[in-house]
């Protein structure tokens, strides 16, 4: 943070013998501090600029206050002509190798955890998709088995009816008796097939 000015030649001349500040009767303490500040030469970061005279902002404020109290015609901005704000070079502290290594280790751990989280989500999605397709395959197979069972039931009942109707002609001469006998046999066969079919469906539902 800036706290000083690089004094310009105008301020140095004004404070010297016969300078513009001589008639202003500066307080002894203020003059001594200003002369001490301007007398010290500091070597700045840029060696081409040579030694630099640094004046603190506090001294500049005290000088400004004194000039205002005396109603001086000498303005501060005129005295500061050629002066610049001094910005000290920021020296970066050396990084702790232990801390750097620890930060790198934490960074790698975080990257690995993020990678595992992403791949875990992908694996879960693949498993869910695989489970859905497997369930769909089971449902299709169950539906196919049900259709075949119903078809076999109908074929068996019809075959029982036809066989009984044709075979009963040697026992019954009337068509009504032959039809009744065929219906009775077909019903018995149908009930037996229905019982077997229901038991088979219960077993399949139990497996699901």
UniProtKB/Swiss-Prot annotation:
Keyword Transmembrane: yes
Main location: membrane
UniProt xrefs under InterPro entries: ATPase_Vma12
Lineage, broadest ranks: Eukaryota, Metazoa, Chordata, Craniata, Vertebrata
Subcellular location: Cytoplasmic vesicle, COPI-coated vesicle membrane; Endoplasmic reticulum-Golgi intermediate compartment membrane; Endoplasmic reticulum membrane
A GO biological process held by the record: lysosomal lumen acidification
Naturally occurring in which organism (per UniProt): Pongo abelii (Sumatran orangutan)
Record-given protein name: Vacuolar ATPase assembly protein VMA12
Modified residue annotations for N-acetylalanine: 2
């Amino acid at each position: 943070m800036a706290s000083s000015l690089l004094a310009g030649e105008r301020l140095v001349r004004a404070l010297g013998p016969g300078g513009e500040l001589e008639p202003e009767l500066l307080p002894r303490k203020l003059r001594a501090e200003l002369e001490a500040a301007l007398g010290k030469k500091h070597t700045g970061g840029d060696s081409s600029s040579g030694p630099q005279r640094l004046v603190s902002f506090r001294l500049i404020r005290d000088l400004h206050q004194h000039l205002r109290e005396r109603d001086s015609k000498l303005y501060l901005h005129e005295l500061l002509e050629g002066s610049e704000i001094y910005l000290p070079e920021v020296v970066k502290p050396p990084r702790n190798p232990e801390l750097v290594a620890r930060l790198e280790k934490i960074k790698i751990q975080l990257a690995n955890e993020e990678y595992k989280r992403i791949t875990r989500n992908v694996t879960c999605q693949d498993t869910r998709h695989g489970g859905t397709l497997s369930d769909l395959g089971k449902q299709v197979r169950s539906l196919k088995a049900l259709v075949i069972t119903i078809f076999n039931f109908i074929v068996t009942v019809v075959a029982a009816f036809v066989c009984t109707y044709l075979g009963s002609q040697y026992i019954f001469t009337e068509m009504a008796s032959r039809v009744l006998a065929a219906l009775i046999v077909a019903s018995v066969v149908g009930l037996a097939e229905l019982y077997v079919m229901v038991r088979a469906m219960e077993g399949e539902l139990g497996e699901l």
